């Protein structure tokens, strides 16, 4: 677990010396990235890479174009490029120009890298990429369960300013460890342990039935599907607004 803390701490302190090392580590093929970092890969790796990059896109580009790298790593590296745009370190035009090149650089077979490309084009407004996206969908390269054509049309309808504003709603770089790492199960476990200690100190354990004490933690609110409307009224699907990518 200590290496997970280290990843976020390096990102928080913008440690650019970590950038080439992280690129080498996460360029390893197969399931190694997930064996090392678990859900951090899909949850925050793009933001971590952007945070330690110092605005240098070369490492993320190397991951994206490495056909031996894990497909999800390649996808989130594209998110890292978007994070540099929304944080003001790179321009939208430069990022979009590169994404247009990817339609001809990526191997023409379905994978998370194609889903990621569709997502980032939608994030930055897909006008320039609309024809290439149409061909990618027609060729079955993009998983419509991840992002369907309606999502592309909705992003297009927002206009460039609206799409960019929507993209900026999401956190771009790592700036708050508690907020960035709060989704991890270990912190919820620790919180429950601390709560138990306080109860003991206040002599409240006697009032807890054994059934309550051993009951599993359950979700108290309905789970929101990724294709359902965002509960905050953004007009977007949950997966395009508040859901982790």
Language model regions located:
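Histidine/lysine/aspartate-rich catalytic loop segments that bind and position anionic ligands
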Residues: 68-94
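Residue-level detector of extended alpha-helical repeat arrays and alpha-solenoid scaffolds
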Residues: 3, 38, 42, 73-74, ...
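Non-membrane alpha-helical segments in proteins
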Residues: 1-12, 40-47
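Internal, hydrophobic cores of structured domains that mediate oligomerization or house catalytic pockets
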Residues: 17, 21-66, 72
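Acidic/negatively charged segments and metal-coordination signatures
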Residues: 11-12, 47, 51, 55-58, ...
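Catalytic DNA-binding helix-loop module of base-excision-repair DNA glycosylases/AP lyases
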Residues: 76-80, 113-120
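Short inter-helical turns and helix N-cap capping residues of alpha-solenoid HEAT/ARM repeat scaffolds
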Residues: 29-30, 38, 68-70, 106-110, ...
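Ligand-binding pocket scaffold of soluble enzyme catalytic domains
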Residues: 2, 8, 77-84, 124
């Amino acid at each position: 677990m200590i290496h997970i803390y280290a990843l976020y701490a390096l990102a928080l302190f913008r440690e650019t010396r970590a950038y080439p090392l992280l690129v080498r580590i996460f360029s390893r093929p197969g399931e190694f990235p997930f064996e090392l970092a678990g859900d951090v890969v899909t949850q925050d790796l793009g933001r971590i890479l952007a945070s330690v990059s110092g605005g240098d896109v070369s490492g993320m580009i190397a991951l994206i174009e490495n056909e031996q790298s894990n497909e999800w790593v390649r996808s989130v590296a594209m998110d890292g490029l978007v994070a540099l745009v929304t944080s003001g370190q790179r321009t939208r035009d430069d990022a979009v120009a590169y994404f247009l090149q990817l339609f001809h650089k990526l191997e023409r077979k379905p994978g998370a890298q194609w889903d990621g490309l569709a997502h980032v084009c939608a994030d930055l407004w897909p006008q320039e990429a609309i024809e290439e996206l149409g061909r990618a969908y027609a060729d079955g390269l993009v998983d419509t369960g991840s992002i369907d054509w309606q999502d592309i049309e909705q992003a297009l309808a927002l206009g460039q300013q609206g799409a960019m504003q929507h993209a900026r709603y999401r956190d771009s770089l790592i700036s708050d460890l508690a907020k960035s790492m709060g989704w991890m199960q270990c912190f919820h476990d620790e919180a429950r342990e601390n709560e138990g200690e306080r109860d003991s100190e206040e002599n409240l354990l006697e009032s807890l039935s054994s059934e309550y004490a051993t009951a599993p933690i359950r979700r108290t609110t309905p789970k929101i599907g990724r294709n359902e409307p965002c509960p905050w009224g953004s007009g977007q699907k949950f997966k395009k607004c508040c859901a982790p990518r």
